[in-house]
């Protein structure tokens, strides 16, 4: 279960959005920011003196200690979740960097996902090219993760409230916000669906496109729209 948040940060409530709820703690999502220099925090050792051998020995010792601790506390899923997270981290040290590397993707694929403007410095205003690049990158990474056996990938658009708003909670100006967000999302989403189909992955992949709730049909003060809890969209 991999989560690809908005490139500007988390949505409201942060990681609680992909917590395990009533399921065991190991069911929670793993956060990845594919546009950052280090997409997964603390994935690799920071100290030069930590070798692959010493890291493996440390992991073996930790596994034995955790097993002893866990056997004395049956039914507590928190330690099991931590154990699984370490095991996942060990696997990801080998597989994650390759999955995040887009250098072998063709120019046509990158362009389809809106990644033909990489390195552009975007201004503070919300705009289509920026949304297309960052949302498209997440869509392409999602395809690569699915190819490598990840069962569930969650892609987010829009971060927590700030000013000007860079999300879908458009109380002030719905055209300013929803226009670029929707156009940018359309580019990446269309490329992802087409790519999955061409590779035969759409045969066993379900795409669920959902939102929190809708907006009112009437304006709010001027150019914004208020919440409409009666029009959830899926």
Regions found by a protein language model. Name each.
Residues 1-234:
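Ligand-binding pockets and gating/stacking loops
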């Amino acid at each position: 279960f991999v989560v690809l948040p908005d490139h500007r940060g988390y949505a409201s409530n942060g990681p609680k959005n992909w917590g395990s709820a009533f399921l065991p703690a190991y069911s929670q999502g793993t956060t990845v920011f594919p546009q950052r220099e280090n997409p997964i925090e603390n994935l690799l050792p920071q100290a030069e003196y930590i070798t692959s051998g010493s890291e493996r020995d440390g992991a073996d010792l930790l596994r034995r200690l955790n097993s002893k601790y866990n056997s004395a506390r049956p039914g507590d899923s928190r330690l099991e979740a931590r154990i699984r997270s370490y095991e996942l981290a060990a696997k990801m040290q080998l597989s994650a960097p390759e999955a995040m590397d887009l250098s072998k993707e063709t120019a046509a694929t990158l362009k389809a996902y809106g990644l033909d403007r990489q390195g552009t410095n975007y201004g503070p205003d919300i705009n289509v090219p920026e949304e297309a690049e960052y949302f498209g990158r997440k869509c392409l990474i999602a395809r690569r993760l699915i190819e490598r056996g990840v069962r569930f990938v969650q892609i987010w658009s829009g971060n927590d409230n700030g000013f000007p708003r860079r999300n879908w909670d458009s109380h002030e100006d719905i055209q300013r916000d929803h226009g670029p967000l929707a156009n940018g999302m359309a580019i990446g989403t269309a490329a992802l669906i087409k790519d999955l189909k061409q590779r035969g992955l759409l045969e066993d992949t379900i795409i669920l496109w959902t939102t929190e709730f809708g907006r009112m049909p009437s304006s709010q003060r001027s150019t914004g729209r208020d919440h409409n809890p009666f029009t959830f969209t899926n």
